[in-house]
């Protein structure tokens, strides 16, 4: 029976819920199928009971208290403002809350009375000290503009460069997230002062000790994202580190006094700088994030290279100057001691550039694909890849996108905007990676190389296409030309080539000592038949002038072929000129001409010897 039952196939429609809400909103504006009328200060609002009950616990209790027949059609509400109720109704049908700085308190009071918790949370977050409506809108836009994962190789490089600039904003969003447990209770205003844009630009941001404690409006310690700062805030995995000072004190009196040179004085005394022990203030891009941790933190340790640092670690050291190094072995042992691996957990970390660049980011795991998403607020965008939801629609062609930055790039097709400009030829591009590929034309950089034939390409898709063809891994037959001796011998035959009844021409033994590539007493070459040879004359007689003319034509053919070959190989007149200069030292005939030797004994043909030895370059 189980085999007879077909498997159920679920086909999701991600846009169905939004389309239903849009249809209900159109019915509300048109007054169709509305089953309740809300009256607030003589203003009427026609709506649907089911939508109100789904959004508000107050309306759910009101509409489900009795039977449907006994419930009235008109409800008059006197505890909310008309603007607040209109904004809440718009939120119920469009999932968008439109507020201003003037009516945020009225909307908060109405949401509390109607028991709409999500609106209460948003209004409380906006009304916190240091926040405003404009900053909330900017934060939402920045969250949408941050790229989370790569769709291809080129976009990955572009998004990594953008994340280098936008990472502090992600951390700011993480710190600004409200606690769900404490969201309902009103929070007390912060006691810390607010930074203006001018104060922030004039404030050093690298190290905590760069503040002047006596200056007015002191803001305490600015977080430098070092490991020491993270350990104090429990944001970095803390290892079992023993106490530093007692563990190093036994080594000091026995090891260090005799290792230092006598002329090296003690470290200069630095005055202690009193630090405020208030909560840490995080200032990022003209934004001050309120710390949720109310505990007062201890002041940071003094600078690592101060004399107080060594005094605290080595209390038993004498106050006088240190003695000289006694032997080279002591100096080597001293270096080995300082480079020991176990001291890595004892000495405090130095403020290196790599540690200052360490930026903690919130991480969330996808419940579907179990992928870890780095950055606060990026998990909902990742979930759209599974649900297929595309909330951002183009107003011109109605194409939908999952991310707002993709919609902005798509809108450039309609507006014609090309923000990326080439500095060499003023060419404009829509995408950043298109500009990078274009710049390689000017720079000549080919970063993508084939591992089989070592051919380089400017774009990665060109390399993938080359590898997919597998043209560099196939053994193809050699298509080169025949050797020069074979080409020279082929000119001795007619246009149709040698006939089937070709004879063999034997080189006389006297030519074996002539310079060339052949050695031996006799060499057998394919010879033409008497009827097809160019020396054969139909008249039976041949003059010396005609032989010289035909031989010069043969030399011109050789020169023409060599010229074409040089142009094809070198690809220019300069290479051809160089080839002529090289060819002057080497004749084109590596073999002696057998016909000159064969005709040397004929009467009246003695003047042909100097013509036969003439090379192509001399011609």
From Swiss-Prot:
Residues 129-219 are annotated as: Disordered. Coiled coil: none annotated. SMART domains: BTB (SM00225), ZnF_C2H2 (SM00355). GO terms for molecular function: zinc ion binding. Transmembrane segments: none annotated. InterPro entries: ARM-type_fold, BTB/POZ_dom, SKP1/BTB/POZ_sf, Znf_C2H2_sf, Znf_C2H2_type, ZnFinger_BTB_dom_contain. The keyword Repeat applies. GO terms for cellular component: nucleus. Residues 34-101 form the BTB domain. May be a tumor suppressor gene. This is Zinc finger and BTB domain-containing protein 7C. It comes from Mus musculus. The lineage of its organism: Eukaryota, Metazoa, Chordata, Craniata, Vertebrata. The gene is Zbtb7c.
């Amino acid at each position: 029976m189980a085999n007879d039952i077909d498997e159920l196939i679920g086909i999701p429609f991600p846009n169905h819920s939004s389309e239903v809400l849009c249809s209900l909103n159109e019915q509300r504006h048109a007054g169709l199928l509305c089953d309740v009328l809300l009256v607030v200060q003589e203003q009427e609002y026609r709506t649907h009971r089911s939508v109100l009950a789904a959004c508000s616990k107050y309306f759910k209790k009101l509409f489900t208290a009795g039977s449907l027949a006994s419930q009235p059609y008109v409800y008059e509400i006197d505890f909310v403002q008309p603007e607040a109720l209109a904004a809440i109704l718009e939120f119920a049908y469009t999932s968008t809350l439109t507020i201003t700085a003037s009516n945020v308190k009225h909307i908060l009071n109405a949401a509390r009375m109607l028991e709409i918790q999500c609106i209460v949370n948003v209004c409380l977050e906006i009304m916190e000290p240091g926040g405003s409506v404009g900053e909330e809108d900017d934060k939402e836009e920045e969250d949408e503009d941050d790229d989370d994962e790569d769709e291809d190789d080129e976009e990955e490089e572009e998004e990594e460069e953008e994340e280098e600039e936008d990472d502090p904003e992600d951390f700011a969003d993480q710190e600004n997230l409200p606690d769900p447990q404490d969201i309902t209770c009103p929070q007390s205003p912060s006691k810390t002062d607010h930074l203006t844009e001018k104060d922030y630009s004039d404030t050093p941001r690298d190290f905590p000790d760069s503040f002047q404690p006596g200056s007015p409006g002191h803001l305490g310690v600015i977080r430098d994202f070092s490991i020491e700062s993270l350990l104090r805030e429990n944001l970095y995995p803390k290892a079992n580190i023993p106490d530093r000072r007692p563990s190093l004190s036994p080594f000091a009196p026995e090891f260090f006094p005799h290792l230092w040179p006598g002329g090296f004085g003690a470290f200069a005394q630095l005055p202690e700088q009193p630090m405020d022990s208030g909560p840490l203030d995080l200032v990022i891009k003209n934004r001050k994030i309120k710390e949720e941790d109310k505990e007062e933190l201890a002041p940071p340790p003094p600078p690592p290279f101060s004399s107080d640092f060594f005094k605290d670690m080595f209390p038993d050291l004498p106050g006088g100057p240190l003695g000289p190094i006694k032997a080279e072995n002591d100096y080597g042992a001293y270096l080995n001691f300082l480079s020991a691996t176990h001291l890595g957990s004892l000495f405090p970390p130095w403020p290196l550039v790599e540690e200052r660049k360490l930026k903690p980011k919130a991480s969330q795991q996808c419940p579907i694909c179990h992928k870890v998403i780095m950055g606060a607020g990026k998990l909902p965008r990742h979930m759209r890849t599974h649900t297929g939801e595309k909330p951002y629609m183009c107003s011109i062609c109605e194409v939908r996108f999952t991310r707002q930055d993709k919609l902005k790039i798509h809108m450039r097709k309609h507006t014609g905007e090309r923000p990326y400009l080439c500095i060499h030829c003023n060419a404009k591009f829509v995408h950043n990676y298109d500009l990078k590929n274009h710049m390689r034309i000017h720079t000549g950089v080919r970063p993508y190389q084939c591992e089989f034939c070592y051919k380089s390409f400017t774009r990665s898709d060109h390399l993938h296409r080359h590898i997919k063809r597998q043209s560099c891994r196939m053994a193809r037959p050699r298509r080169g030309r025949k050797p020069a001796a074979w080409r020279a011998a082929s000119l001795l035959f007619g246009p149709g080539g040698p006939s089937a009844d070709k004879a063999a021409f034997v080189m006389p033994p006297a030519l074996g000592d002539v310079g060339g590539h052949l050695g031996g007493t006799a060499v057998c070459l394919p010879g033409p038949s008497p009827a097809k040879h160019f020396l054969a004359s139909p008249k039976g007689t041949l003059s010396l002038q005609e032989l010289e003319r035909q031989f010069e034509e043969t030399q011109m053919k050789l020169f023409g072929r060599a010229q074409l070959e040089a142009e094809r190989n070198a690809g220019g007149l300069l290479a051809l000129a160089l080839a002529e200069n090289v060819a002057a030292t080497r004749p084109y005939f590596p073999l002696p001409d057998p016909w000159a030797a064969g005709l040397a004994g004929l009467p009246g043909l003695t003047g042909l010897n100097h013509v036969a030895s003439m090379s192509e370059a001399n011609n």
